[in-house]
Design a protein with these regions (language model features):
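Basic/polar N-terminal segments that are highly enriched at the extreme N-terminus
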Residues: 1-7
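Active-site glycine- and acidic-residue-rich loops that bind
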Residues: 112-116, 184-196
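Metallo-beta-lactamase
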Residues: 80-94, 98-110, 120, 127-187
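Catalytic metal-binding/acid-base residues of hydrolase active sites
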Residues: 65-67, 108, 139, 191-193
Length: 205
């Protein structure tokens, strides 16, 4: 989508591997493997696609991929050797400091891992120093107080988000919320409590 008021595009953090059974659930393997061949560990390769929305007054990044600070054992397990988000943003003429809002649709590691990074001293810091991080309050509460069934869905990536709160970059919202004119966060059933999508309207589109 692109017009004189807004542009919307995909910016990739690369790919990762996830267990095919976890991805397709009740769908029999004999059906899904026709289109997605698993590796020897039954993992299928998925894209880590983030969305970049550019309006006349704001740059908005939707989700951040896995990021670069996961331990080597985790990178190997998920087949994600390095983060490509910053490089691909630069290809779009955007630096981390240019991002005004980071919208995290939910807080599983493959969506929020790149929200923070490690500096040269080993400290966890926000990846986007000037951005407000927009998160549903229900998603935040669930991530930091998960029930026993939800614990495996979250990782250190969530704990690292505390630094965003400490630096006053956290913007918790409740329900459908307009981020900037024409760009709205909309709560929608998904993989976790407080999951949301982002809608963009401009020029009659």
């Amino acid at each position: 989508m692109k017009n004189d008021k807004v542009s919307v595009g995909i910016v990739s953090d690369g790919t990762f591997l996830l267990d095919g059974g976890a991805v397709f659930g009740l769908v029999p393997k004999t059906l899904w493997e026709r289109n997605m061949k698993p590796d020897r560990r039954n993992r299928v390769r998925l894209g880590l696609n983030c969305m970049l929305i550019r309006t006349l007054n704001a740059n908005i990044l939707v989700d951040t991929g896995i990021g670069s600070k996961e331990p080597e054992i985790t990178k190997e397990f998920y087949g994600h050797s390095s983060s490509k988000l910053a490089t691909n943003l630069r290809k779009e003429g955007i630096s981390a400091k240019d991002i005004d809002y980071v919208v995290l649709t939910h807080l599983h590691f493959e969506k929020c891992g790149g929200a923070t990074k490690m500096d040269r001293e080993g400290n966890i810091i926000p990846s986007f120093p000037k951005a407000k991080y927009v998160i549903q309050k229900d998603a935040w509460n669930e991530a930091f107080n998960p029930n026993e069934w939800a614990v495996p869905k979250y990782s250190n990536a969530v704990k690292h988000l505390k630094v965003i709160e400490e630096r006053d970059q956290l913007q918790l919202i409740e329900g459908n919320t307009e981020i900037v004119p024409g760009v709205e966060a909309v709560v929608l059933d998904g993989p976790s409590i407080g999951h949301m999508i982002v809608t963009v309207k401009a020029g009659g589109e």
